[in-house]
């Protein structure tokens, strides 16, 4: 075990032009001497040796790679190489919010704590109010931004990033939240901003298609939802194998299925081009996860969870008159055939060619054009 406390893992893909901003934000940390930086290359042609000379006061390790695998597996290589007690990750085009960010996360560590959550800000385009960063206060967000994780806990519970290239951090975090059910383990929060999520580099998959898609990233209603569905299915199946009597899994499954309804209804209104794809995502989640527990969930419980989630989505639903009630949505899913990849391919074939071309650049769907989940037959 290293004498240092925290590893800062950085997945780096074609990041030579902007990684120095990220490293500079680590250089100024008040607890810099307790930190190890591990850069996991995700492009074999990249060379980051220059950063060791530019930041001589940082302990920096650079991990090579044979091929591009996506941010999840790059982060995992950081975790595998780390010898500290704690780890946090930061994208190469992001920065820590201020010099106290890592100290604030450290101060959140208590006995039996396996994760510390800070607040992150999202950089936004200039606007009349001159606001550049918007705090994101939703503690349950699925990303790894501004969070500190206990490595011993992760390794003991075999919680790792998968090969997913979209919402891979959602799968990772959902595994953690369901795994601590029934154990005296804590996820602590610190009410301080620790991380700035910047707008991203031009090759970021979360930015692809902005110009072609009326100013909104293509990712939001498309591959993000495909990835989130696969991530949730994988997390549920992983946790069920480890503890099939975990009630947290059932609750999470119901909540995710209800969320599929709101995603579909909003997509119909805001981006109908992807409505069929999002309905498929809901069908997939139903058949892979929800169907198995459906008989355990009463209509009253469903109504309560629906009401809670409607409140969460209230601002997103302004001006939208749902074409289906939740229970009509459920009946529609149950009444239609589900054909897995064959059905997904048919839906994708109806999308404009420019969407297919941009999605291919992201690599999310892989060579087979489909994201397989745990135990799914090919």
Language model features with spans:
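Residue-level recognition of alpha-helix termini/interfacial anchor residues
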Residues: 55, 157, 248-252, 289, ...
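P-loop NTPase catalytic cores that bind/hydrolyze ATP
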Residues: 246-272
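Generic structural signal for hydrophobic core residues of well-folded globular domains
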Residues: 177-180, 239, 261-269, 333
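Nucleotide-sugar donor-binding/catalytic module of glycosyltransferases
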Residues: 1-233, 237-245, 337, 348-354, ...
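General helical secondary-structure elements
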Residues: 71, 113, 128, 143, ...
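Short runs of predominantly hydrophobic/aromatic residues within well-ordered alpha helices
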Residues: 173, 250-258, 286, 302
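Membrane-interface aromatic/basic loop that binds lipid-linked glycans or pyrophosphate carriers
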Residues: 45, 268-378
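Alpha-helix boundary/N-cap detector
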Residues: 223-230, 252, 277, 342
């Amino acid at each position: 075990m290293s004498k240092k406390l925290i590893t800062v893992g950085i997945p780096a893909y074609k990041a030579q032009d902007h990684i120095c901003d990220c490293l500079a934000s680590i250089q100024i940390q008040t607890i810099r001497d307790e930190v190890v930086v591990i850069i996991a290359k995700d492009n074999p042609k990249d060379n980051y040796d220059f950063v060791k000379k530019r930041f001589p006061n940082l302990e920096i390790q650079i991990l090579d790679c044979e091929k591009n695998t996506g941010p999840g597996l790059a982060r995992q290589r950081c975790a595998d190489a780390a010898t500290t007690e704690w780890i946090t990750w930061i994208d190469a085009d992001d920065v820590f919010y201020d010099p106290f960010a890592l100290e604030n996360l450290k101060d959140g560590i208590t006995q039996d704590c396996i994760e510390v959550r800070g607040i992150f800000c999202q950089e936004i385009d200039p606007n009349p109010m001159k606001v550049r960063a918007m705090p994101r206060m939703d503690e349950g967000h699925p990303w790894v931004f501004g969070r500190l994780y206990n490595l011993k806990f992760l390794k003991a519970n075999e919680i790792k990033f998968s090969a997913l290239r979209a919402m891979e951090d959602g799968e990772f975090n959902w595994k953690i939240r369901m795994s601590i059910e029934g154990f005296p383990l804590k996820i602590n929060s610190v009410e301080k901003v620790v991380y700035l999520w910047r707008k991203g580099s031009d090759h970021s998959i979360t930015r692809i298609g902005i110009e072609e898609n009326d100013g909104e990233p293509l990712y939001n209603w498309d591959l993000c939802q495909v990835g989130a569905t696969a991530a949730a299915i994988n997390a549920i199946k992983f946790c069920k194998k480890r503890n099939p009597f975990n009630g947290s899994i059932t609750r999470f499954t119901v909540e995710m299925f209800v969320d599929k309804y709101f995603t579909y209804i909003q997509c119909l209104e805001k981006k109908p081009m992807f409505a069929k794809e999002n309905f498929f995502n809901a069908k997939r989640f139903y058949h892979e996860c929800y169907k198995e527990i459906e008989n355990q969930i009463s209509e009253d419980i469903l109504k309560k969870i629906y009401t809670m989630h409607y409140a969460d989505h209230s601002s997103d639903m302004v001006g939208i008159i749902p074409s289906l009630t939740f229970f009509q949505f459920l009946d529609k899913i149950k009444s239609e055939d589900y054909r897995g990849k064959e059905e997904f391919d048919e839906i994708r074939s109806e999308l404009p060619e420019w969407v297919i071309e941009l999605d291919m650049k992201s690599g999310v769907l892989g060579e087979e054009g489909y994201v397989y989940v745990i135990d799914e037959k090919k």
